[in-house]
Amino acid sequence: MRKAMLTTIGVPLLMVATSADAARSDLTTAVSRTATDLIETWRGQGRRGQILRFVQPSLIGLIDGTISTLAPIFAAAFLAGSHAALMVGLAASIGAAISMGLSEALSDDGELSGRGSAAVRGALTGIATFVGGTFHALPFLINDTPTALKVAYVVVGMELITIAWVRRRFLSVPVHRSLIQVTMGGCVVAALGALMGHV
């Protein structure tokens, strides 16, 4: 009786586990193929194609994610502390990533402009936006708000330097000019967030 019950319970569990393993394997294969396809597409493009199809969508997302989420994160930090800033930052990053990804994908299907797959550009923009917004939210895993803010300032600085490097590498924008342009925007947004956090 007990053996029959164990068999009755065990077989479905084994089937579920096998199905989960198969699904995981399929997902891994799909991700690997997608990454390989993207790399091959990148290599097959000229410099102009690389910029229009890959660099520009990613850069737009990185700049937007880095700058647009500063205000809500710092406002939440000053108003309610580290945990609130972390949650607000993650929520803002997710919302911005979805919004920017859809905007990029829906605003240009790539046929007239020659900018390639709308889905790929949308995905790149969305991922870059999420990364840009999330990195300076992660310091608020630190419970001590003043310490978290100091770490966040350093992370934001690193993000701005990365943006300046990408613009220099692919768009030939001088590093100092890029830093001034992006830093000014970031400072304005961060200052507004801090101001709102003290109201």
What spans do the regions from the language model cover?
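Positively charged n-region of N-terminal signal peptides that target proteins for export
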Residues: 1-3
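Hydrophobic, small-residue-rich transmembrane alpha-helices and their short perimembrane loops
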Residues: 6, 10-136, 148-159, 189, ...
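Short helix-capping/hinge motifs at transmembrane helix termini and TM-loop junctions
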Residues: 79-80, 140-144, 171-172
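Short, surface-exposed, charge-dense and proline/glycine-enriched linear segments
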Residues: 113-117, 138, 166, 182-184
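Structural signal for membrane-spanning alpha-helices in multi-pass inner-membrane proteins
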Residues: 136, 140, 163-168, 193
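Interfacial loop-to-transmembrane junctions
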Residues: 162-188
